[in-house]
Each structure stands twice: as C-alpha cells, then as structure tokens.
Amino acid sequence: FLPIASLLGKYL
C-alpha cells in the first residue's frame, strides 16, 4: 500500500 496511507493511519 502507499506510504502516505501509513502516515494517515498514525494521525487517524
């Protein structure tokens, strides 16, 4: 999956 999704997961 995209690395951006990982960052969003941390914030959400």
Swiss-Prot record:
Listed GO biological process terms: defense response to bacterium
Cellular localization per UniProt: Secreted
Tissue specificity note: Expressed by the skin glands.
Domain of life, source organism: Eukaryota
UniProt GO cellular component terms: extracellular region
Keywords for the protein's UniProt record, in alphabetical order: Amphibian defense peptide, Antibiotic, Antimicrobial, Secreted
Role: May act as an antimicrobial peptide. Show low antibacterial activity against Gram-positive bacterium S.aureus (MIC>200 uM). Shows no detectable hemolytic activity towards human erythrocytes.
Family membership noted in the UniProt record: Belongs to the frog skin active peptide (FSAP) family. Temporin subfamily.
Name by which UniProt lists this protein: Ranatuerin-5
